Amino acid sequence: MNQQLVAEYFDHKDGRLYWKKVAHPNKQYLVGQEAGSIHATGYRHVTWQGKVHKVHRLIFLLEHGYMPKEIDHINGDRQDNRLENLREVTRSQNQYNKPMCKNNTSGSRGVSWHKASKAWVVRVSVNQKSRLIGYFKDLELADLVGTMAREKYHGQYAHS
């Protein structure tokens, strides 16, 4: 798949992908309509040429002429496919700002209760490895230290 082929079938504007051309004569009504639908993962997908594609990846290809291995939604909103919200990242960088786990009990990213120590433990992922930051009796302090560690190690990719 290349930019020229995608541009033959799709236009994009304001983070939305629109059908420019369709292959099947019975689908001509789609021309000019927004392409795809929202998947259970929260990403907008479109079926084209017998394959399912994430819309943000097609928009990135249309604009930049290549498709990187990883593309990040800067603001974390998987449906916000505006160009200014998309950036090429490494796998590690993309993991740094993923949403907080649903089973998180502390309410703080990277902070969990350590029974044996009777303290909150702060861990941060660095280059796909968990790094122990420290143990804290106070949850607010653990949260603050965790935020500072993410800013230090993740930089612009840190997620609060």
Ranges and model annotations:
Residues 1-44, 48:
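Short helix-coil boundary/hinge micro-motifs
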Residues 22-23, 49-128:
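Short, cationic Gly/His-enriched loop motifs
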Residues 129-139:
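A short, exposed loop/beta-hairpin motif centered on an aromatic-Gly-Thr core
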Residues 47, 112, 135-137:
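Generic structural detector for well-ordered beta-strands
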Residues 89-95, 152-160:
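Extended, polar beta-sheet/loop recognition surfaces of beta-rich domains
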Residues 16, 133, 157-160:
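Intrinsically disordered, low-complexity regulatory segments
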Residues 137-153:
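A short, charged, amphipathic alpha-helix used as a generic interaction element across diverse proteins
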